[in-house]
């Protein structure tokens, strides 16, 4: 019986802030591809400033009648307000009297039901910000080209099948959001928007960019993620001011050599494409800090590429075809903070490859073909998160004791039969995952891991636990399911912070110690498929609180009831 009091978190994207004071919340578009990276995936970044956050509470704003909207317009005119926010009013039609608000510089119409705008909006000649996200717009009035001062136009989450022709004529624009529409093409007239510093056209159906994109010489951020691009025009190299370029989730087969002209770029997202090679010219992008090549068809990098990228701190090569580490020696990792090589075919970490990696804190080697670790393994003293899951490791070297900064260690799905005594030296360890190995016992030294909060030992061959387990008083999660445990030590009662305890599928576990009643914070206890004959079925059905109460009543702790 398992009683779960877990907390499911609904999440929603936070959309980027518009210029001025506006905020808008958008809807996340699922890409259908699961990211299973273990140790802190490096740089699945989103240049549209999108991050996952819990759903906000439902809006309490009442649906507006046309009369109420007109009242708002009148109030704005009387107060001579320069900012008008009519977001989330369920507006179907914007009154033509909007034309009277010529003093406006900011107009926010997020999350309404607009299918069109009245041409009178073109009378608002002082507008700097026009926010129209989350409506049902299919077009825009030609009168918008009267907005000679407009700098920010937000058209995210509408039903546009093309970029309205009038948009290309608003040459004052510096920020243009077109995310999550149904746009298939970008016209040559994009060159007219030469003042753009931010262009987001992610999550559309665009198959190619015109050569004229290269005339946007002021672009700093270009986000074309989640489209259908197979190639980039070589003219992209003319956009030399770009610092953020997001091309993830396209169908890119190659990159132009001119990519090396982007001397200011510091973030380059290329994950989930069809690249088989990276141009050598990328070595000239010396300001690059984050490079994400996850889920492509790359087997080698140009020799010396990483050594040339002297500011690179985050590198993701996960889900490619690498059979060995990139050629370039130890110097190529001297600035790297996070390295993700998950899901490749690497069978060896070269000796000394991290001898200059003094800031390397996160290494993910999950799902490779490692059978052993290098002899200098113990010198990785800066390592904080280490993921070696799903390999073929049969033992961990004793000099693991040198990894004194380690906080998260994942060794699940290997062939380990025992742990080294040196494990006890990892005093900062907070999470230790040993699921699905062949462990028959744990060393007593595990008692020294007093900061440990999560210990996963599921699916091993453990018959007992060391009594020192009771010293892990910060433990909140203990997974012991699918083992051969015959009993639990009474010291388990000292785990005063334990919240989740999994004991399921231990066929030799016939009883629970009365001391378990002292674990007052237990909210999840899984005991399925354990022959616990001393627990009445109705007690088991009641969940952790009933079981704890029963153990108190039956044992020496009844005075605590």
From Swiss-Prot:
<dbReference type="InterPro" id="IPR003591">
    <property type="entry name" value="Leu-rich_rpt_typical-subtyp"/>
</dbReference>
<dbReference type="Pfam" id="PF23598">
    <property type="entry name" value="LRR_14"/>
</dbReference>
<comment type="similarity">
    <text>Belongs to the SHOC2 family.</text>
</comment>
<feature type="repeat" description="LRR 3">
    <location>
        <begin position="126"/>
        <end position="148"/>
    </location>
</feature>
<dbReference type="GO" id="GO:0005634">
    <property type="term" value="C:nucleus"/>
</dbReference>
<dbReference type="GO" id="GO:0005225">
    <property type="term" value="F:volume-sensitive anion channel activity"/>
</dbReference>
<dbReference type="GO" id="GO:0019903">
    <property type="term" value="F:protein phosphatase binding"/>
</dbReference>
<dbReference type="InterPro" id="IPR050216">
    <property type="entry name" value="LRR_domain-containing"/>
</dbReference>
<protein>
    <recommendedName>
        <fullName>Leucine-rich repeat protein SHOC-2</fullName>
    </recommendedName>
</protein>
<dbReference type="GO" id="GO:0046579">
    <property type="term" value="P:positive regulation of Ras protein signal transduction"/>
</dbReference>
<feature type="repeat" description="LRR 17">
    <location>
        <begin position="451"/>
        <end position="473"/>
    </location>
</feature>
<dbReference type="GO" id="GO:0005737">
    <property type="term" value="C:cytoplasm"/>
</dbReference>
<comment type="function">
    <text>Core component of the SHOC2-MRAS-PP1c (SMP) holophosphatase complex that regulates activation of the MAPK pathway. Acts as a scaffolding protein in the SMP complex. The SMP complex specifically dephosphorylates the inhibitory phosphorylation Raf kinases, stimulating their kinase activities. The SMP complex enhances the dephosphorylation activity and substrate specificity of PP1c.</text>
</comment>
<feature type="repeat" description="LRR 12">
    <location>
        <begin position="335"/>
        <end position="356"/>
    </location>
</feature>
<feature type="repeat" description="LRR 2">
    <location>
        <begin position="103"/>
        <end position="124"/>
    </location>
</feature>
<feature type="repeat" description="LRR 14">
    <location>
        <begin position="382"/>
        <end position="403"/>
    </location>
</feature>
<dbReference type="InterPro" id="IPR001611">
    <property type="entry name" value="Leu-rich_rpt"/>
</dbReference>
<feature type="repeat" description="LRR 20">
    <location>
        <begin position="521"/>
        <end position="542"/>
    </location>
</feature>
<feature type="repeat" description="LRR 19">
    <location>
        <begin position="497"/>
        <end position="519"/>
    </location>
</feature>
<dbReference type="InterPro" id="IPR055414">
    <property type="entry name" value="LRR_R13L4/SHOC2-like"/>
</dbReference>
<feature type="region of interest" description="Disordered">
    <location>
        <begin position="1"/>
        <end position="67"/>
    </location>
</feature>
<feature type="repeat" description="LRR 18">
    <location>
        <begin position="474"/>
        <end position="495"/>
    </location>
</feature>
<feature type="compositionally biased region" description="Basic and acidic residues">
    <location>
        <begin position="1"/>
        <end position="36"/>
    </location>
</feature>
<feature type="repeat" description="LRR 10">
    <location>
        <begin position="287"/>
        <end position="308"/>
    </location>
</feature>
<feature type="repeat" description="LRR 8">
    <location>
        <begin position="241"/>
        <end position="262"/>
    </location>
</feature>
<feature type="repeat" description="LRR 15">
    <location>
        <begin position="405"/>
        <end position="427"/>
    </location>
</feature>
<feature type="repeat" description="LRR 9">
    <location>
        <begin position="264"/>
        <end position="286"/>
    </location>
</feature>
<feature type="repeat" description="LRR 5">
    <location>
        <begin position="172"/>
        <end position="193"/>
    </location>
</feature>
<dbReference type="GO" id="GO:0035556">
    <property type="term" value="P:intracellular signal transduction"/>
</dbReference>
<feature type="repeat" description="LRR 11">
    <location>
        <begin position="311"/>
        <end position="332"/>
    </location>
</feature>
<dbReference type="InterPro" id="IPR032675">
    <property type="entry name" value="LRR_dom_sf"/>
</dbReference>
<dbReference type="Pfam" id="PF13855">
    <property type="entry name" value="LRR_8"/>
</dbReference>
<feature type="repeat" description="LRR 4">
    <location>
        <begin position="149"/>
        <end position="170"/>
    </location>
</feature>
<keyword id="KW-0677">Repeat</keyword>
<keyword id="KW-0539">Nucleus</keyword>
<keyword id="KW-0433">Leucine-rich repeat</keyword>
<keyword id="KW-0963">Cytoplasm</keyword>
<feature type="repeat" description="LRR 13">
    <location>
        <begin position="359"/>
        <end position="379"/>
    </location>
</feature>
<dbReference type="GO" id="GO:0140361">
    <property type="term" value="P:cyclic-GMP-AMP transmembrane import across plasma membrane"/>
</dbReference>
<dbReference type="GO" id="GO:0000164">
    <property type="term" value="C:protein phosphatase type 1 complex"/>
</dbReference>
<feature type="repeat" description="LRR 7">
    <location>
        <begin position="218"/>
        <end position="239"/>
    </location>
</feature>
<feature type="repeat" description="LRR 16">
    <location>
        <begin position="428"/>
        <end position="449"/>
    </location>
</feature>
